Amino acid sequence: MFQIAILAFSLSTDAFAASVAKGVRFPNMSWLRSAGIALGFGTLEGLAPLIGYLLGKQFAGTIEGYDHWFAFIILAGLGLRMIWRSFHPETLSSPQMTPTWAAVLATAVGTSIDATAVGLTLALFGDNIPLTLFVIGIVTFVLTLIGLRVGGLIGERTGRWAELAGGFGLIAIGANILVTHLTA
């Protein structure tokens, strides 16, 4: 169980960081909307290893060779968009706006690509695959919800500077994924 918990927290850190950036961008997001986004992140992060496991049986070498590039491109693109918006205040959200589901989905996919790759190793957890997926999903849900709320508090106080930092944060997450895989 300890290994499952470590795996879940490790896979959830990208989702946490991305959710802080989303919270900064949309500081007045409702709890209900935050819970919906966290549920989406948790569900996708929990299912991603299963997808990786199933795909890995078919395309193990191909997926492993490119997953980090996809994650980097998605997260860097979202980060650059946030940086651009920080210099164009008219595009910043009003207090009532929330992220689009397309933006949430793109971020969730970008942060769950590593989890998909981890799915290739699910056999190491033996008969605990369903438990592993459940724990990953729950931990990601909780950390995403916390990240959205913390980001909202930061965003209310720092405005466009937080948007700029959030953009660099997403780029850093993507770059970390890329560098980690290229140097491994």
Curated annotation (Swiss-Prot):
Compartmental location: Cell inner membrane
Disulphide bridges, residue numbers: none
Cross-referenced InterPro entries: Mntp/YtaF (IPR003810), Put_MntP (IPR022929)
The organism's place on the tree of life at top rank: Bacteria
Pfam families associated with the record: Mntp
Primary location group: membrane
GO molecular function: manganese ion transmembrane transporter activity
UniProt keyword terms in alphabetical order: Cell inner membrane, Cell membrane, Ion transport, Manganese, Membrane, Transmembrane, Transmembrane helix, Transport
UniProt membrane topology term: Multi-pass membrane protein
GO CC annotation terms, alphabetical: plasma membrane
Transmembrane regions: 35-55, 59-79, 105-125, 128-148, 164-184
Cited function: Probably functions as a manganese efflux pump.
Protein family (similarity comment): Belongs to the MntP (TC 9.B.29) family.
PANTHER family reported for this sequence: MANGANESE EFFLUX PUMP MNTP-RELATED
Protein name as annotated: Putative manganese efflux pump MntP
Source species of the chain: Rhodopseudomonas palustris (strain BisB18)
Lineage, highest ranks first: Bacteria, Pseudomonadati, Pseudomonadota, Alphaproteobacteria, Hyphomicrobiales
Name of the gene encoding the protein in the UniProt record: mntP
